Regions:
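Repeated scaffold domains used in trafficking and secretory/extracellular systems
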Residues: 24-32, 64-74, 101-113, 139-153
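Beta-strand C-termini and the immediately following turn/loop, strongest in propeller blades
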Residues: 41-48, 80-86, 117-125, 155
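Beta-strand-rich domains and repeat architectures in extracellular enzymes and scaffolds
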Residues: 3, 10-51, 61-71
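Beta-rich carbohydrate-recognition and catalytic domains
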Residues: 46-47, 58, 92-95, 122, ...
Length: 155
């Protein structure tokens, strides 16, 4: 749900030179605007097999093998599903979660954006992982290993 209280109703026009990004990167794909219209983000290719996210002309510091599914959380943070060394996870404002999976998809948010969930697959098991603002995992079902405080623990 969009928080209309955070909108800047006074600004008449804001220009973000999105077209200029083409000259700064190999290519630009999947542009995605924030719900309040203040930010535009896109996946950018910086070199062969190296991708970043660019927000209002500023690139994330971290580089990833692949990136997709840009989404702004209700609290304004930008998330992306990212791949590092063939394993997938979620990056929030450029910082990747520690836990990696065979695949990840369908990022979802709590109403206030404090909790982020993503569907994941690991070793032919499918589940949903949810993470709160303190970094603790709230749910992890269907794996041979349990996640506690963001770390895998043998059962």
């Amino acid at each position: 749900m969009i928080n209309l209280k955070s909108w800047d109703w006074e600004s008449s026009e804001k220009m973000i030179p999105f077209g200029d990004w083409q000259g700064n990167f190999e290519w630009v794909e999947e542009p995605y605007a924030s719900p309040d219209g203040e930010k535009i983000a896109a996946i950018v290719n910086v070199a062969e097999g190296e991708f970043k996210v660019c927000v209002n002309g500023e690139s994330w510091e971290n580089t990833f093998d692949k990136i997709w599914y840009l989404r702004f959380a209700p609290d304004g943070r930008l998330t992306a599903i990212v791949s590092e060394m063939g394993e997938w996870t979620v990056a929030v404002d450029g910082a990747a979660w520690e836990n990696k999976f065979g695949y990840a998809w369908n990022t979802l948010f709590s109403h206030d954006g404090r909790h982020i969930a993503v569907a994941v697959q690991q070793d032919m098991a499918y589940t949903t992982i949810a993470r709160n603002g303190t970094g603790l995992y709230l749910a992890a079902f269907g794996f041979d290993q349990e996640l506690r405080n963001g770390r895998q623990v043998e059962r």
